[in-house]
Amino acid sequence: MLDIKFIRENTEAVKANLVNRHNDFDLDEVIELDRKRRELLQMTEALKSERNAETKKIALAKKNKEDASAAISAMREVGTKIAAIDKELAGVELILQDRLLRIPNMTDASVPVGKDDSENPEVRRWGEIRKFPFPAKEHYELGENLGILDSERAGKVSGARFYFYLSMAARLERAVYNFMLDVHTQQNDFTEVIPPYIINGASMQGTGQLPKFEDDMYKVEGENMYMTPTAEVPLTNYFSGEILDGAVLPVHLTALTPCFRKEAGSAGKDTRGLIRQHQFHKVEMVKYCKPEDSWDELESLTAEAEKILQLLKLPYHVVCLCTGDIGFSSAKTYDIEVWMPGQQKYREISSCSNCLDFQARRANIRFRRHQRDKPEFVHTLNGSGLAVGRTVAAIMENYQQEDGTIVVPDVLRSYMNGLEIIGKRESFVSSKGE
């Protein structure tokens, strides 16, 4: 959330940021609400001073045994006015708070201005794209041919955008996320967390999912609770409402969770395969740090996500999201996109973002540099490390062989009892009813 004082003093810059983000939010309404709020505060303060003066008159009159009825009447009239203004003020503040929660973060000056993902500049690339001596298949075709991915039966059980992982696909998924967690906790100095998967509305608001993105989340019927869309939410809210000792910063947390998303607005996109599912695993990384350290932390966070792909020997490139593509809460984001031979293009597998104090203001997360210092807002960062299903898909496509089998990457073999090749699964014996 942006500070209202910052908005008041930098109105044109905030408007320009909205234009660059292609966001049609009406900032003038916020400016008017802020003006009205300050006007009402001044009115009520003036009336309270008047009421205090009348109270003193009443006390003096009673002390002198004089008639205080006029002063009492005047005080009651002032009290009625104060109550009316306070009621109006509460209404204005409620609307103002709602509008402030809908304003996106300010993008950093280094973020390129652009309309959409087609204008995200490449920052760097890594790895050599393999040249196949045969037509490369997409992962879902490979998985279905091997009998280890089943969308048909998942559709019967749950609907579109779900999969059953069977046998070695399930083992591969498990190997991938255990490998990721081991790298982050043993090499990258993250603390592993198992967070709640059902999250309250206040926490969703803290990270910026609410109120803007409610339509893309699964809500628990009859409750202000949601299925987690990403571990960013519980990990970032771990310290909500707290003041940290600056000596503990930075704090680095990582978690594997299932993620649940409606994928609203994705009709017709990636209707087959593991790229865009309603339910998927993701290893998330979240950092809390002092303001002066957050840009260095963004670079290290991105490198930590890249390290997973490098160890898996999967080619990728890094792009910087432009103003028209960057997320609501982010000041700057790097997307890591892995090469998918079956699709002949790069696909997003991680987003690494510096949110500055935007989320910390919403969730009220602060720190003190020293015991007597005034609390400051921390800076928060988050990044996928990585999306597990997309990593499995990338492994299947990049490590496929002409006969449709899949070579297990070297670093994963110890997680799969030394298995080197994923071959065809023997089908279940089944009989279909009439």
What does each of the following model-derived ranges do?
Residues 125-434:
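TRNA-recognition modules of translation machinery and tRNA-sensing kinases, especially anticodon-binding
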